Amino acid sequence: MLTFGTAGLRGPVAPGPDGMNVTTVTRATAGLADWLIARGHAGAPVVVGRDARNGSEEFAAATREVLAARGFDVIALPDPAPTPVTAFATRVHGAAAGVMITASHNPPRDNGYKVYLGDPPCPGAQLVGPADREIEAAIAATEPAEIPRRPVAPDRRARAARADYLARICARFEDAVARPLRIALTPLHGVGGDLAVEALARCGFSDVHVVGEQFAPDPDFPTVAFPNPEEPGATDLLLALADDVDADLAVALDPDADRCAVGIRDGDRWRMLTGDETGALLGTWVLDAVAESAVPHGDRPVVASSIVSGTLLHAAALRRGADARRTLTGFKWLVRAGEPLVYAYEEALGHCVDPAAVRDKDGISAAVAAAFLASSWIGRGGLAAALGALHAENGVHVTAPRSLRLDDPSEIAAIMAGLRTAPPAALAGIPVTAADYAERTDGLRTDGVELTGRRPDGVALRVFARPSGTEPKLKYYGQLSAPVADGSVSTVHHELSQLLDDVLAELPAGSRGEEIRR
């Protein structure tokens, strides 16, 4: 049976309690409505949006009609739209909640039901506990036969949501300078293509070339094995286009456009930046813009990254006098890291560049920010040079993940137990110590183990190990960092990359671990 958690619902579109279907969505919405009414939100605005996946229109209709029958003021977005538009509308209209029908970058068979709440101190953010457990209990108490529905049409607010979101993006970047830039872009068969192209054009970037085979929304995602820009092969068409048109920047959105991946020309080849590289570049760009702004900001600006993300942004932020904070994984925690929050990211390609308007990851505004950043480096070596400058300033940081699929959950538990009780004494010749995050007494307590160490020459190692919360996987997140002394940035980067491969290869993998590369 599908259970309601902080991510709402997500699963295959299928009949019965184990699948996403109209009955499941109807019950979930009735439970959410009852919970909102019990908290004093009867008759309040609630935003409902959807992507273009199989079942999304039917599920959105069920959601808005159940809410309308319960007396809520439903803001029903009229067309398939990116998830950030729903998050934005929830916040800007002071809604009690927002519901987005999407499964983001999951396989074509899946769909989902994501919930934002309007409660302070973080209105428009994804819900956190105990709200998920309370809503789950309300859903369990609901019988499908008792749930009425009432048709509801999009009103002026709903019809204006797209234009309002675009206007906000223009306002967010009104002080940035756009220089001529050629961009290659793909929405990976999702709903972000038209909106991204229009947002870029309105901010001064009209030279945009799109991957035609992937531009129109298609719930079957026919050109990719997985519609996730992290996956091998997903951005092959994008990078080929970027090379063909001699682009300055490549951008890939995931299907609901809440994630943004950036590709750059690095020497004689194109490559996708890692989420950590993009996060460090965008985060420092935001901080530098804040420092140059004439608007007083009072307290030190806050940037946030998750415990599995790299530490390059952390180092750069501290050098700039900012407050750099770490949170548990997930934007429900990142956007609650502290105030005044100016930027948040996690290594899985999620970026929040406008937390005043969207308290979640937002691929559209991240793409616009990347365009402004890239245009500022035209004639100076591009984003490859920008990244090199960041490494020269803060030390070279190299990150890489390793994921293992282990169908036996007991094997994952055994590996985690071994890391806690008998961790390796060294990895690739670097002595390490282990810290068990399950024993922490602060807000970072979780099922994870961190291995850290340092060589006499200043090379620092960090590996975070944790089981996946949604799949039978064990995940390692590795990082090596080192100051740039005698060697060049590229030389140090190459040496650390090779060493990190050795580190990850020495980590426990279990007897039947299937390597998952991304």
Predicted features, each with a name:
Residues 1-70, 156-181, 191, 464, ...:
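An N-terminal, well-structured beta->alpha segment
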Residues 47-110, 201-262:
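N-terminal small/polar loop signature for handling phosphorylated ligands or for N-terminal nucleophile
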Residues 2-18, 103-106, 187-199, 345-350, ...:
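Conserved phosphate/anionic-ligand binding catalytic regions in large, soluble enzymes, centered on
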Residues 243, 247-249, 253, 269, ...:
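Phosphate-binding and adjacent anionic-ligand microenvironments
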Residues 2-3, 12, 111-242:
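Gly/Ser/Thr-enriched, mixed-charge loops and adjacent short helices
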Residues 116, 121-148, 278-301, 305-315, ...:
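Glycine-rich phosphate-binding loop plus the immediately following alpha-helix
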Residues 58-67, 109-118, 196, 258-278, ...:
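Short Gly/Thr/Asp-enriched flexible loops that form oxyanion-binding sites at enzyme active sites
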